[in-house]
Amino acid sequence: MAPSWKFKFDGRILFIGYGSVSRCTLPLIERHFDMPLSRVTVVDAEDRSIDIAPFTAKGVSYVVEPIFRKNMAAVLARYVGPGDLILNLSVEVSSIDVMAWCQKNRVLYLDTCVEPWANYYDNPKIPEEERTNYFLRYSAKEKAKKWGERATSALVTHGANPGLISHFVKEALLEIAKRKKVKAAKPRSREEWAALAKRVGTKVIHVAEHDLQIANRPKRSGEFVNTWSIPGFTGEGAQPAELGWGSHEKRLPKDGNRAQGGAEMRHLSRSARLHDPGPLLDAHRRADDGLPHHPWRGDHAGRLPDGLGEGPRGLPAHGALRLSPRQ
């Protein structure tokens, strides 16, 4: 069914990467943007021309050209300029460096995670704490402080989850308030959302996703099947483990340490206890990127468990937590 509205966009759009996320996003651009597809370019590190053929037939330009630190500026300048948009949906292309280029050239920017250059997550020369999502996220925020209030918009880590799920969480808080008969106007600030979360008794937010993908070979009993980006998933699995820790939780777990030291084991070697049986803890931006939005700063504000404090290089911890290996 055709959408009832379309967003008119007069600029050009550059996709970096044509992996699993881009393949889902490009149809949305076609459906919801009022613009010719001839103004859309996809730059990819691998040749996926067969996969993207239905869109190149409609006018999308497809270029196979890996982006590295040394050629990044030249490649980007070839396809976009002031008023255009970059969708960085790749792996191993630095989000922070691309954002910095976008600021200099007045180009809009959006990505689904703060991605580093290649060979970062498993580089033993880089301290563990600097390989966490927490560190990458706040490094991007520190960089953005230099841009000022009139900077070109850059929306970071805003895909489906994290991203769209943040809007679902807000709707859920309003629905819980309605069911609990808590009278509250729709919050208009972080502080008001935090106050509403406290009023309705929110302590833990468990995001459960129902994957509707169907494979041509049924999943076997006890088999794990990855249904999204293989490079993205393996990259997450190589990162240190981290959790968001609530101010209502007065003690650290047995092998938990504060954020500034980084984690001492990889995500996919850390088990976690959830409603679902037998999970392993995987790196995910949702573990820390919602924390600054929902802290309660009223009564008992700032009384985090012993061991939680400043994050890496003095960045605010917001309850970020690292996990040490089991003995």
Enumerate the predicted regions with their spans:
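Rossmann-fold cofactor-recognition segment
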Residues: T56-K70
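A short, basic/flexible loop-to-alpha-helix module at the beginning of a structural domain
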Residues: M1-G11
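NAD(P)-binding Rossmann-fold cofactor-contacting core
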Residues: D34-P54
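Conserved Rossmann-fold cofactor-binding substructure of NAD(P)-dependent oxidoreductases
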Residues: I67-Y79
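Glycine-rich adenosine-cofactor-binding loop
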Residues: R12-P27
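C-terminal catalytic/substrate-binding lobe primarily of soluble NAD(P)-dependent oxidoreductases
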Residues: E175-Q327
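Adenosine-phosphate binding glycine-rich loop
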Residues: I126-G201
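Rossmann-fold NAD(P)-binding glycine/threonine-rich loop
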Residues: V93-V107, T112-A151
